[in-house]
């Protein structure tokens, strides 16, 4: 494959797709493409027809790829929404735990942290009054 003249990966991909196997397009779009390939004395109309079939196949591939990308984007957006909600819930829980923890509990928690770890804003699991975990 001669791709030296193509500068971007997209140009290379388009070149590769354009030069993809005629038999693949034939199976995808109909058997008449194979006859054009086998006919070495193809007329200009046959070449145009072949180019049109290739363009249709490329459009089909592009549409399928766009559909797959849109689906993946929707899945990722939903995951982001779920993570944002979980983050908000954890922030609310953290705020509640900060307000319920006594200064002694905060000091005890911070003393258990290793020296290389920065101290968090609040304990992760402080004990509630009475000695039980919240």
Swiss-Prot record:
Subunit structure: Can form homodimers, however it is likely to function as a monomer. Interacts with NFKB1. Interacts (via N-terminus) with JUN and FOS; these interactions inhibit the binding of active AP1 to its target DNA. Interacts with MYOD1. Interacts with HDAC1; this interaction affects HDAC1 activity on MYOG promoter and thus inhibits MYOD1 transcriptional activity.
Biased composition annotated in UniProt, kind: Low complexity: 125-134
The keyword Protease belongs to this UniProt entry's keyword annotation: no
Function: Protects T-cells from IL2 deprivation-induced apoptosis through the inhibition of FOXO3A transcriptional activity that leads to the down-regulation of the pro-apoptotic factor BCL2L11. In macrophages, plays a role in the anti-inflammatory and immunosuppressive effects of glucocorticoids and IL10. In T-cells, inhibits anti-CD3-induced NFKB1 nuclear translocation and thereby NFKB1 DNA-binding activities. In vitro, suppresses AP-1 transcription factor complex DNA-binding activities.
Protein name: TSC22 domain family protein 3
Domain of life of the native organism: Eukaryota
UniProt keyword terms in alphabetical order: Cytoplasm, Nucleus, Phosphoprotein
Family: Belongs to the TSC-22/Dip/Bun family.
């Amino acid at each position: 494959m001669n791709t030296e003249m193509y500068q971007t990966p997209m140009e290379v991909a388009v070149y590769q797709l354009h030069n993809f196997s005629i038999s693949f397009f034939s199976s995808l779009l109909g058997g008449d493409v194979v006859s054009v390939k086998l006919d070495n004395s193809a007329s200009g109309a046959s070449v145009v027809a072949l180019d049109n079939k290739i363009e249709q196949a490329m459009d089909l591939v592009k549409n399928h790829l766009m559909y797959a990308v849109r689906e993946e984007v929707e899945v990722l957006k939903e995951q982001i929404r779920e993570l944002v909600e979980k983050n908000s819930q954890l922030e609310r829980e953290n705020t509640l735990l900060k307000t319920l923890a006594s200064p002694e509990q905060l000091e005890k928690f911070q003393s258990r942290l290793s020296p290389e770890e920065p101290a968090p804003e609040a304990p992760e699991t402080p004990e509630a009054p009475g000695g039980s975990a919240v």
